[in-house]
């Protein structure tokens, strides 16, 4: 196993433990009410479809109806899988003028409970190279679309997906990276391959990704000159932006989403 895969295995092991800890606090599967909480404005100006982008893996593609060339985002799901929560976030982002491909690292499976989610995430931990290939294929799929500016593609994910967003950045050239409370790499030498800005969203009460680790990550980015914007929301814990979780914090979630849109607009639309 190469050092990159070993690092990814270690990162996923820590993240799976963090997700499991969060699930033990009573985090249920998303419901229709939970999905409604994620809706951010009018999405009537978009179209969506399921697309095959890697082997038999189907992703959820959301894009503006109007003709044009748009920046794009590879969106990566939490440990539950490509569920309705993530699809709603893809719709919301597409409505802001992005082509969004929400990937499926589980090949069609979605965890119905924390045990199933842990097993699905554990399979990725056992074969991390395939997950990297999956996400890299998503980038290439977007580059091949006629309506995508192939110089303006970002990655974005939450929790498990936040960690994978960073891992994609370590393995593929992008234009921006967004990490919501994902496990972090704090070795500046390893991070130095990243040549574009990073947005990080975290909670001060997140015991799985403590503030000390976030600060080390920020310091490592600064050490090698990687532009970054790190926000630590006081008084909220892990997965605070997930309305199906016990830590859901709607005000902080709204603010984080606004900061995410500002960041992506600045890095991808200018």
Predicted regions and their residues:
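C-terminal catalytic histidine-bearing segment of alpha/beta-hydrolase fold enzymes
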Residues: 222-270
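Primarily recognizes the serine-hydrolase "nucleophile elbow" in alpha/beta-hydrolase
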Residues: 136-194
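Serine-hydrolase catalytic machinery in alpha/beta-hydrolase-like enzymes
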Residues: 24-144, 244
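Short beta-strand/loop motif that positions the catalytic acidic residue
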Residues: 200-202
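Bacterial signal peptide processing site
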Residues: 20-22
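Acidic catalytic loop of the alpha/beta-hydrolase fold
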Residues: 205-209
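Short alpha-helix in the alpha/beta-hydrolase fold that links the catalytic acid
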Residues: 89, 210-220
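C-terminal motif of bacterial Sec signal peptides marking the signal peptidase cleavage site
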Residues: 16-18
